[in-house]
Curated annotation (Swiss-Prot):
Keywords: Metal-binding, NAD, NADP, Oxidoreductase, Zinc. The gene is neoA. This is 2-deoxy-scyllo-inosamine dehydrogenase. Zn(2+) 2 binds at residues 89, 92, 95, 103. It comes from the Bacteria. Binds 2 Zn(2+) ions per subunit. Its cofactor is Zn(2+).
Length: 340
């Protein structure tokens, strides 16, 4: 089978290897689609956390079960599935509290063990979620990022009627816009430097989309009091955006840190947080929102067509990574069709 391998920082190679055999409690999955996440790009550049070289990347995927090793999951053979990247123990205090991304023995598909940028992969049966037959596999590869967005919105406690601004309109940012609406909130503005991504946000009904220049969102909120948000969700990870989120949100409001970049230190003035009595809260990963994300996508309540902007065969991995890294041609998500 073909498999993309990250061997070292900025060194990706397409390999041919045997189809892996599932260990006890695992399933063999034939991958259909895998989208390229911002964390994959940071991993490629060597500036991510908790990863191991060499490894097959990829954690936003869909596919179908070919085989299982053991009695559990036998009913999944032949079914279309997605899967949680989080390989947690299920028994530690963090897992028991519903925060598996903080597991004391955490592993992650596509980071510490081989992921979905391959024609086949092995996945713990416990991580698999079956898909309804009506949900296309291309759409289903966005279950994981949608779960990330739902988890972030819920961690910030967005309630009906609240106004929310989103910083960054890449894949996660555009899903945050729709997740806020699912919870009854109103997205009043998006800040994004790439024109095509701003256009995608406007197409989703966001009333205002400003550029990524420092101060653009703050200027908007000062010129239009109705645009002052109760919550700002920062999804870009850029250092200046964190401080701008703190300045743009209303006094007593909440700031959610969803994106981050290890290679650059964020700048946040504590006095703004203290004087405005703000709540700043972080969110990472899908949490426990995987099943809901499957149901939401199957219902058609969230549109992912604007996210999946550039399709590639695995043979074209170099171009896929380049387009995603440069955000060329309005790229929001490069994705691989593993069955092309």
């Amino acid at each position: 089978m073909k498999a993309l391998v990250f061997e070292a920082p900025e060194r990706a190679v397409l390999t041919h290897r045997d189809i892996p055999a599932p260990a006890p409690g695992e399933a063999l999955v034939r991958v259909a689609y895998n989208s390229v996440c911002g964390s994959d790009l940071s991993f490629y550049k060597g500036v991510w956390h908790g990863f191991t070289y060499p490894v097959v990347p990829g954690h936003e995927w869909s596919g179908s079960v070919v085989d299982v090793n053991g009695p559990r999951g036998a009913d999944l053979v032949g079914r279309n599935v997605v899967g949680d990247l989080t390989c947690s123990c299920g028994t530690c205090a963090h897992c028991a509290a519903g925060t598996p991304t903080l597991c004391e023995d955490l592993g992650e598909l596509g980071f510490t063990r081989d992921g979905a940028c391959a024609e086949y992969m092995t996945v713990p049966v416990a991580n698999l979620r079956p898909l309804p037959d009506t949900l296309p596999l291309r759409t289903a590869c966005q279950v994981e990022p949608l779960a990330v967005a739902l988890n972030a919105v819920d961690r910030l406690g967005v309630t009906p009627g609240e106004k929310v601004a989103v910083m960054g309109a890449g894949g996660i940012g555009l899903l945050l816009v729709q997740a806020v609406r699912l919870r009854g909130g109103t997205v009043t503005a998006v800040a994004e430097p790439v024109p095509e991504r701003r256009a995608a946000a406007l197409a989703l009904g966001v009333p205002a989309a400003v550029g990524g220049d420092p101060g653009a969102l703050v200027e908007l909120t000062r010129s239009d009091p109705a645009a002052v948000p109760d919550v700002v969700l920062e999804a870009s990870g850029y250092p200046t955006a964190v401080q701008e989120a703190v300045e743009a949100v209303r006094p007593g409001g909440r700031v959610g840190l969803v994106g981050y970049r290890i290679e650059e230190a964020a700048v946040m003035a504590p006095h703004h947080i203290v004087l405005k009595v703000l709540t700043v809260r972080a969110s990472m990963g899908p949490g426990t929102r995987f099943e809901e994300a499957v149901d939401v996508l199957a219902s058609g309540a969230v549109d992912v067509d604007a996210l999946l902007s550039h399709e590639f065969a695995l043979d074209d991995y170099a171009k896929a990574l380049d387009v995603a890294l440069r955000r060329a041609d309005g790229n929001t998500r490069s994705y691989f069709n593993l069955r092309a």
